[in-house]
Amino acid sequence: MSTATLAAAVSSVRIVARQMPDNSASVVPLVTHCSNCHLRDLCLPCGMAGGDVDRLDSLKFGRRKVLAGQTLYREGDGFQFIYAVRSGTFKSSLMLADGREQVSGFYMAGELMGLDGVAHGAHASSTTALEDAEICTIPYAHFASVAASNSGMQHVVSRLMSREIVREHSLMVLLGSMNAEERLAAFLLNLSQRLKARGYSASEFHLRMSRAEIGSYLGMTLETVSRTFSAFQQQRLLEVDKRHIRITDLDGLTRAFETRVH
């Protein structure tokens, strides 16, 4: 596997009868505009010129609290909004024919959700909060109409679509060509990088997702996930206390992953 493919895999590993999403949580006017939001360098305005960010501020965004376990939208629901995570963690998933849930991604502050609905006007997955969270709701039709006459915002739309393609490609690489230790190492390194970008510790964090959800995302059984965590502890790469993770040798975890891949 090439170094470029490895880098993409680590940086992008970012997951019944249908019902309408639970919209009981209120949507309130957005108090913090994109131009002065502390997440602007990670979220929608990233790379935008000042004038384009001002245009974003003119759009009618809403803010909404989402409780742990609450589903934001379900697979098959009509597409209206894209969502920016302000705080908390979400998982995206889809239902397999045999009734099992397949986790397809995890999202944290500054990341966008709901783009899977752009192509066909309906969401291809469900998204659920893993902890109490807050989001910005962005009416896609309004956003797209403003972007249609603005080259800077058109570039943003293209970047967002490209990011989704890269994420899907990286997941295929992860599932198709890596063993269990490589998959879990890539997952932990990715979380570490994303948390560091948000000002948190790169070496010590609490997993918001269960081991079963990690296994579903990585294509591993719960037992294999547990065994692999134990193997990393024995190699003194990690300390694990339930969902609390401390990477004791970040360079070693990275080197071990790169050595296995090559």
Located regions from the model:
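Cyclic nucleotide-binding regulatory module and flanking cytosolic helices
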Residues: 3-68, 112, 117-120
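Short aromatic/basic micro-patch
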Residues: 63, 106, 137, 208, ...
